[in-house]
């Protein structure tokens, strides 16, 4: 989220305070004054050690809608997700686990996790992304 494509690029990170709440936080990354990424963090607790890793209901998902500047056509979603909000194992980013015991910390593709998800921007510049409770999504945009 915080990286820039080359040393001479100008990177600006913005917290979207007006859109954020107690349970969601939103950030944008602009590279050379162009929107490059949107970060969505869901802060709800789910399946935590406080309730012995048992939540009585399926993991809720929130849909977030965005309207992009002209020229943005598509994007890809990379997700940070685990079985619960305070999990120490089973954590993946964009479908890969970086657990040391799998390949000494190198990314290993997990068969049961989505990778390289695409979003389509409609003709009005809008798109939606679903974010499960206690997870994060980075939408990298083609603008």
Where are these regions (language model features)?
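Catalytic cores of secreted or luminal carbohydrate-active enzymes
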Residues: 1-22
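Carbohydrate-binding surface patches
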Residues: 20-71, 79-84, 137
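Acidic, Ser/Thr/Pro-rich beta/coil linker or hinge segments at domain junctions
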Residues: 53-131
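Short Pro-Gly-centered flexible turn/kink motifs
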Residues: 130-141
